[in-house]
């Protein structure tokens, strides 16, 4: 039995948590709460300029961040078409999206994620999640809840569930050019 309700409560309280994704555990929080995102960046020692990935099981949870006016029906079809591998899409960001999410860019990286844990967390919280690999600087990304506890301590909030078992992290691509920023 996992600890889903506790992790949902932590997210609603704007805390950083660890949860399983396609290949590794991710560190996530409420992207709408600046203090939560800044806590994540500090924990990860990640520069704000890099920006963050947002994931959700539905397009609707990601729409508040995406500038829809710059996308055509063909772009949406590409984004919503299921793929053998997970793909994070770099898309135009709405002007109101804070820099702590976009970094130095006018884009936002988003991914539709159908991992049961992510579906449960997003449905119960009502928001998308930030997603960055769960590891301390210089360490390998965590692939199990036990590895998260070893790196971050026994009391760190981690969802007791499994990743989808993929070997590689999701690919990162530009929605307009299909340019691959990170091979999956």
Curated annotation (Swiss-Prot):
Gene Ontology annotations for the cellular component aspect, listed alphabetically: cytoplasm
InterPro entries linked to this entry: DHBP_synth_RibB-like_a/b_dom, Sua5-like_dom, TC-AMP_synthase, TC-AMP_synthase_SUA5
EC number: 2.7.7.87
Pfam families for the chain: Sua5_yciO_yrdC
EC main group: transferase
UniProt keyword annotation of tRNA processing present: yes
Keyword Nucleotidyltransferase belongs to the record: yes
Catalyses which reaction(s): L-threonine + hydrogencarbonate + ATP = L-threonylcarbamoyladenylate + diphosphate + H2O
Domain YrdC-like residues, every copy: 1-184
A GO term, aspect molecular function: double-stranded RNA binding
Keywords, sorted A to Z: ATP-binding, Cytoplasm, Nucleotide-binding, Nucleotidyltransferase, Transferase, tRNA processing
GO BP, sorted A to Z: regulation of translational fidelity; tRNA threonylcarbamoyladenosine modification
Location of this chain's protein in the cell: Cytoplasm
Role description: Required for the formation of a threonylcarbamoyl group on adenosine at position 37 (t(6)A37) in tRNAs that read codons beginning with adenine. Catalyzes the conversion of L-threonine, HCO(3)(-)/CO(2) and ATP to give threonylcarbamoyl-AMP (TC-AMP) as the acyladenylate intermediate, with the release of diphosphate.
Family note: Belongs to the SUA5 family. TsaC subfamily.
Protein name: Threonylcarbamoyl-AMP synthase
Native source species: Actinobacillus pleuropneumoniae serotype 5b (strain L20)
Name of the gene: tsaC
